[in-house]
Regions:
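Exposed, interaction-prone regions of secreted/extracellular proteins
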Residues: 1-301
């Protein structure tokens, strides 16, 4: 069962409302939540414009580029208005695609200042598109699957603390919208066990994020023909509404035990590249260091 999301940051562009997802701004009426307990793949419904016409989602690159978008938050921002999207990442391409990607991802300390939304994740894509850096994909069939940490935690939960992160599993497209699993609390200092595994030749995948401390997890299943080959792997820092360098953690983000497989075997000769298409006007001290084929560290301060 799918329900429309109401928790994530929204903004208005050219008369349409957009939601900040971990792959850019998507029309809000096309961003859905699926219950983590429902592991049968729930297909995304058709995405249509406000006038009821089928649309290809051309995402707003930022929430306030070109003066077309009014910010929901009037707080002064010391960073440039287009300082969002993928701000740090590492990439690896295997033309034959992947059958799984697994890793551990640390849960950093909470930023001292609150961004609109900060996303941290590993992910698998079908094309090499970098939100807010490379031109938007104007053809259909772009996708990404990803277990995602987000700050702040946004769901209503009496147990959530001010410094807690949220954790979900995501599937995002630019022509059919996005689908996310139920948000769970991810406390700072924990570790996320990330798992994206292909379960069928028809493009079926399980996207799973579990907490090492408790075993709590948030999972979704997806089946789409566009997912048959996912040849691009990433680890990423993505932000929307970052209001200065204090909207980053103090501690590093650690991606460890990275593993990629194809046809039942480990992918050989993995060579990650740090920021091959970098943020053009970096303002903070973000940096990505490739420690090895299995370990990548992102620092913020």
């Amino acid at each position: 069962m799918l329900t429309l999301d109401t928790s994530l940051p929204r903004t208005v562009l050219r008369g349409e409302e957009y939601t900040a997802t971990p792959s850019g701004w998507i029309l809000s009426h096309c961003v859905w939540e699926t219950a983590s307990s429902a592991l049968a793949s729930a297909p995304l419904p058709p995405c249509v414009s406000a006038k009821g016409n089928p649309v290809l989602l051309t995402q707003a690159q930022t929430q306030h580029r070109g003066g077309e978008v009014k910010k929901d938050d009037p707080t002064p921002n010391p960073l440039p208005p287009d300082y969002d999207g993928w701000l740090q990442y590492a990439a690896f391409n295997n033309t034959a695609g992947f059958d799984s990607m697994t890793n551990k991802m640390s849960v950093p300390d909470a930023p001292s200042s609150r961004p609109q939304i900060l996303y941290l994740f590993p992910g698998l894509q079908n094309i090499n598109w970098i939100p807010a850096i490379t031109p938007e994909p104007m053809k259909a069939h772009f996708d990404i699957i990803q277990p995602v940490l987000q700050y702040p935690y946004l769901s209503a939960d009496a147990e959530a603390g001010a410094g807690d992160w949220g954790l979900r599993s995501w599937y995002v497209t630019v022509d059919s919208g996005a689908k996310m699993s139920t948000e769970i609390i991810a406390p700072a200092g924990d570790v996320v066990l990330c798992n994206m595994t292909k379960t069928g030749a028809d493009g079926s995948w399980i996207i799973d994020a579990a907490l090492a401390s408790s075993g709590k997890r948030t999972t979704q299943a997806v089946t789409e023909s566009r997912l048959i080959t996912q040849p691009w792997a990433y680890v990423t820092v993505e932000c929307y509404g970052c209001k200065g360098c204090s909207t980053y953690p103090q501690k590093p983000l650690l991606f460890t035990e990275l593993a990629l497989t194809k046809d039942g075997a480990a992918v050989p000769s993995i060579a990650w590249r740090a920021n091959p298409k970098p943020q053009p006007k970096q303002q903070c001290k973000e940096a990505t260091k490739i420690i090895s084929s299995t370990d990548i560290t992102v620092t913020f301060q």
